[in-house]
Each structure stands twice: as structure tokens, then as C-alpha cells.
Amino acid sequence: MKRILVTGASGFVGSRFVERWKGEYTILAPGHGEMDITDVVSVERYCMEKVPDVVVHLAAISNTWYCEQHPEESYRVNVEGACNVALASARCGAKLVFFSSDQVYNGNRESGLLTEDIAVHPENVYGRHKLEAEQRVLGICPEAVALRATWMYDMEREGMPTHANFVLNIAHAIKEGAQLRFPVREYRGITWVKEVVELLPHAFDLPGGVYNFGAENPLNTYETACRYCEMLTGEQDSAIILPDHERYPEHVRNISISMDKAHRASGGTIRFHDTLEGLREADR
């Protein structure tokens, strides 16, 4: 049985990955006391002792606002931590699958679905750190796979960590009769975490490099919210969702991803629903 080391196994994605795949892989899920990703000696010691076949690196500080306020901590975890995991993976011969982010695209001016081969110019701390982590990790482990994940969501599930997200925010607003504003000048993929977890093992066999990994979405965030609210209420013009024309005044914020590269490289096995299709599936 293949041995999979998961960093961040108690987090949003990691906990769901462990639950889904624990019967089909030997899952290694060390806590911080067993393996501290900011300590290269700790990471190498654990990896050399356990000798995983694959390392899925999910541990990160992913709150973009927090990273802006604490850039040194973000760098230590999101860049240096990733490099430590890469060094240990290379030393023990494990395939590394590392989660990056669509935030690397947040300074781009292109329209449409963005591909991995375009130059990127991230404008926030988190995006810059994830981009540097990609570059340094692939320098250490050329066969590593860096997955640029999107904003993710799940329904509330007992025993699973859940944070405020797109679907829960809208569902709660409908229940409470509140209103929410969503930006008109933003385009981004929004992905059901269940699909990420289901498709992640297919990424183990990808050639080394950077891949977008999530739902495509041609709609702006306001349009997406309107369509999801309509799914829940049956009302086409709900007063719950309001347009926000003020956010991103400098330029349209487009971080929508194209999945063509991963789809081709996986022989078609990595195939996400688009954002609206995923929302319909999740709501069944």
C-alpha cells in the first residue's frame, strides 16, 4: 500500500483527504510536535524514518489578510516551510505534490481563463510567497508538482473543520434575510473541496511542473453569487445578492484558471466541474 505523508492533515483540505483515502493508502499525518515544517532537521528526520512514497504538502498560512499583516511569519511557513519539505522529499525519494494558489495571478491584466505559461505579477504577500515557493521547490525537486488551487468550499460537516466560505455565506444570508455584496470586477474559480480531494491522487502521476487545479469559471463573482442564490431560492432576482462596483477600482481582478494543461497531462483523468456545475452537485 502506497505511503502518503500529508502535511496540514488537520486543515480544511487535509482532513478531508485523510478521511477519504485512509483505507486505500497508508496515511502519515504528523502533528506539529512530530514534524515542524519550519525546522528542516525535524522534517528530514521524520521523512527518513517513515520513507513516504508521496508527500502532499498542504500546511500553509492561507489567510491573505493575515499574511499581509505578518509577512515574516508567512515567509517562514509558506516559503521556507515548503523548501524544507522539498529538501526532505528529495532526500527520501518521495514524489512531492505541493499546493500553491491562484493568488499568483492577482496582479495580471489578461482576461479569460489564465494558463500556467503566462508571466505572473502577484500583488499581495500571499501570492508573492506562493510564487517564490513554486520556483524554489521546483529548483530543489524538478519532479515536484505544484498545484495552483482556487477558493474552495464545503457544506458544514460534523467532525470536519469548516470556515466561512462562498456557499455558507450565501446560505446563512438567505436564512437570516441579510444582504451580501460581491464584486463585479472580479473573476475567479470557486471549487468544491470534495472534487479536489477526489482528483488529487491523479496529480501524483503528473510530470513535474506547475498546474492549475480547480474549477473553471467564466462568470464574475457577483454573477456567480446570483446564480447560486437562484439555485437555493428559485428566485431569479433575489434582493439577497447586491453588486459591489467599488472593489478593485484599479483594474479587473481576474484569477480565473484554465484546466487544459492538467487535463491533457493526466490523460483526461483530472477533470473538474466548472464552478456552477460544482455548486449544483454540492447542493444535491
Sequence positions of predicted segments:
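Mid/C-terminal beta-alpha module of Rossmann-like enzyme folds, strongest
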Residues: 199-247, 283
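SDR active-site strand-loop-helix element
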Residues: 7, 30, 55-59, 96-102, ...
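Conserved C-terminal active-site "lid" loop/helix of NAD(P)H-dependent oxidoreductases
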Residues: 220-226, 241-282
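Catalytic helix-loop patch of NAD(P)-dependent Rossmann-fold dehydrogenases
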Residues: 76, 81-84, 104-147, 152-153, ...
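NAD(P)H-binding glycine-rich loop region in Rossmannoid oxidoreductase-like domains
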Residues: 37-77, 88
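NAD(P)-dependent short-chain dehydrogenase/reductase
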Residues: 138-188, 194-195
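N-terminal Rossmann NAD(P)H-binding glycine-rich loop of SDR-like oxidoreductase domains
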Residues: 2-21
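Rossmann-fold cofactor-recognition segment
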Residues: 29-39
